[in-house]
Amino acid sequence: MPADYTSTARALSLPMSPAESLSPAEEDTRPLWSHLASSRRNTASPSVRESTGLRDQVVNQATKMLRRTKKTWRRLTFWQRIGAIGAALLAILLGLSFMIFTGQVFFWLGPVAEKWEQSWLAFFVLWLCVFFVSFPPLVGWSTFGTISGFIYGIWKGWILYATATVLGSTCSFIVSRTILSKFVNRMMERDKRFAALALTLKYDGLKLLCMIRLCPLPYSVCNGAVSTFPTVHPLMYGLATALITPKLLVPAFIGSRIRILSEKNEEMSAASKAVNICSIILTIGIGVFTGWYIYRRTLARAKELEAKERADIRRSLQADHAAHRPHGSFSEDPDVNTAATTLARDEEERIGFNDFDDDNVDLVIDDDSGSEISPNLTKKQFPGPYRDEFTDNDSDVFGDGDGPDSQMFRLHTHVRSG
């Protein structure tokens, strides 16, 4: 019997080896369905795996958004829920009304377009309209661009649209920064994602700003949102807007094609109509695809720069922690330093540091409770690091004995002698 136990224990202690490949003879004896299952696993195409991964990402994002929406909805009071429903219905009605109005406006402009084309007053009024819709939360920027092309043609309409856009976005940036200054400071100190995005503009700010301006984002809202980034200056934002003005040729071109179709509808052949309609559809498709592509690239670049900034901050924290020195400022620019400090706090939590100069964790035991351990882990009660050497002013715990019975912590059990 002992021999059997020994052999069994030895067999159980052996590591589990992976399944060996079967010989051709053994492979023939396998069931047919086993061959089919293995062949399906081995022949899974990369496109199927990629589509499955993309589908999983979409499902995960939708699940997270739904969970976040439910969580926010539960926090709302009864009247807040009624207000949220009313605001959603109002937004839908305004959107539908705006779409209907946009479709009708070109029919109204048809009879007067030729007259307004020669009027500088109409030019100035339309320029002011484009200028003022740059301020959040006004809408209609794209519509006014199409109207500019409809009335003045592609090139003159583009000049009107581009100049009003550059000046309007710059003024909107300055006004929004002045009004939202307190909001900016609060976001910089509390929101690590906001601080990370602000720091990414420190590296290739102009390039990233141009990419943001090319993204299909709400125009006036984008002006107000970018103004909250303290690392972006008004002149830089105006320059980035000026560099992407060739994008504004798209709505101006669409407006000019719509006017040609409306004025020469009866004179044009079916082929000419098809060419103009296809050119409009193609231009819209190119604009949508370009905006989507640049939006994806912008997000990827922002994540890359954020990872780089976090890595630099992490190395700096670890170096100062190893040298037992407090960490200084990250930058001479106060706005950049505030954003970096916010990220540094987040990196401290990830690394496990409690403070810039906190090198040890002390366990505080409450003598009054006798057996309870205080959860407070602080360096203020034990400012000095641990050491084994004693000076004349320190007491030796082994020389003093166990002390009074009220301060003894018994970690053993008493065994009664039988």
Curated annotation (Swiss-Prot):
The keyword Transmembrane helix applies. Residues 103-119, 181-234, 295-418 are cytoplasmic. Its main location: Golgi. GO terms for biological process: mitotic spindle elongation; vesicle-mediated transport. Residues 149-258 are annotated as: VTT domain. Residues 1-10 have a biased composition (Polar residues). Keywords: Golgi apparatus, Membrane, Transmembrane, Transmembrane helix. The chain crosses the membrane at residues 82-102, 120-140, 158-180, 235-255, 274-294. Residues 1-81, 141-157, 256-273 are lumenal. It is found in: Golgi apparatus membrane. It comes from the Eukaryota. GO terms for cellular component: Golgi membrane. Coiled coil: none annotated. InterPro entries: Golgi_membrane_TVP38/TMEM64, VTT_dom. It is a multi-pass membrane protein. The VTT domain was previously called the SNARE-assoc domain. As there is no evidence that this domain associates with SNARE proteins, it was renamed as VMP1, TMEM41, and TVP38 (VTT) domain. Golgi membrane protein involved in vesicular trafficking and spindle migration. This is Golgi apparatus membrane protein tvp38. It comes from Aspergillus fumigatus (strain CBS 144.89 / FGSC A1163 / CEA10).
